[in-house]
Amino acid sequence: MGDERLMKPFDVFITYMSWDGDGKNRPVLAFILGDNTVDVYQITSKYEGKSDAIQAQYFKIDDWAQAGLVTQSYVDTGTLIALSIAAFKDKTLIGHLSENDKQRFLEFLSK
């Protein structure tokens, strides 16, 4: 078993995310770990200018620096994405949600 099994829920990684033939490296929040997959939410710093419906899906990370992020960021809860755990083998853990943000995030999801 590789180091990717050391991944824990609420860890933040940078990984390549693709869509419609394009993509880029983005921060993601590990949420649910399976045997061979990890379900992640994308993290974004883009909030202003989004519709009210989109903003309602964004969870504000209060302790963004502890999460390894360089600016105020939000978890996009609109889509939970399943990725192969093996895809994280060479990825660097940049941080993790604070205890406060973990609790707030779980409350946010339960609404």
Provide a role label for each language-model segment.
Residues 11, 26, 73:
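Short beta-strand or tight-loop elements
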Residues 8, 33, 52-54, 68-75:
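A generic structural signal for short, non-catalytic loop/turn and secondary-structure boundary residues
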Residues 61-111:
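C-terminal terminal-subdomain/extension
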Residues 5-17:
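Short coil-to-beta transition motif at edge beta-strands of beta-rich domains
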Residues 15, 21-25, 30-64:
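Compact nucleic-acid interaction/catalytic patches
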Residues 1-6, 66:
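Short, surface-exposed secondary-structure edge patches
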